[in-house]
Amino acid sequence: MRRDTGRPATVTNNDESMTITSGFLRGTIALAGALALVCASATTARAALSTIVVDTGHTPAHPGATGASGRVEYRYNLDLSAAVAAELGAHGEHVLRTSADGREIALSARSARANDAHADLFVSIHHDSIQQAYLDAGRQREFHGYAIFVSERNPRYAASLRCAREIGERLRAAGETPSLYHADPIRGENRPLIDARLGIHRFDDLVVLRTARVPALLIEAGVIVNPQEEARLAQADTIRRLGAAIAAGIEACTAA
C-alpha cells in the first residue's frame, strides 16, 4: 500500500531524463565551441590591427610656416596629429607618434621610427603656406585647401598612393577641397599632379617620404597664411572633423 504523504507524486522517466541531459550537454558543448570561436576571432582581429606612425611636422625650434595670426605651423600640426592619433587609438590601432614631445628630431629619424616598427603607414601632418612672391603680392586669400604628397622614390609607392587616395576621398566627403597650387609651374612648386580631384601630388625628394621603407605620405591640411582658412583650421570642430577623416582613410587603406 502506498503511503499518502500529502505531497504530489513525482514521476521520473529515466529515458526522458537521459535525453534531456544529453541534449543539455550537447548544447553546452556547442555553446562552448561557439565562444571559443568568438574568442579566437577577437584575438585574430586584435593581432591584425595596423601600426601607424603619426608624425607631427616640424618642431618648436623650427616651427615651419607662420599663420596670418602669428601662430606657428607646429602648433597646428600638433593639434591635428593628436586628433588623428586619438581617433586611430580609439579604434584599437597601434599608434606611434614622432615630434609630439617638442624635442628636436631629424627628418630621417622620423621615417626610421616607422622603418624600425615595420609600420603599415607613416603619415606626416603639416599646414601650408604659399611662395614668398605671392605673400609679398598680398595674395594670401586666394589660396586654401589641403594637399597630399607621395614620393615615387619610396619603395612602397603604390601602397602610398592607395592610402593617399583613401584619405583624399574621406577629406572630400568631410567637405574639404583640394589645393592645386603646388602644381603651378613656378619656382619652388611645379609638383606633378597625380589626382586633381583628390589633391594628390608627387614630391619625390621629400626626405620623410623617400627614406621610409614603408608606405608614406605627407598631408598639408590647409593654408594658414590665409586668415579665413587659418581661423577655420583653429576651430576644435574642424580639427576633430579633419582628424576623423584622415584616420578613416588610414584605416581603409591599411585594412585592404
Describe every region a protein language model picked out:
Residues 28-40:
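Bacterial N-terminal signal peptides
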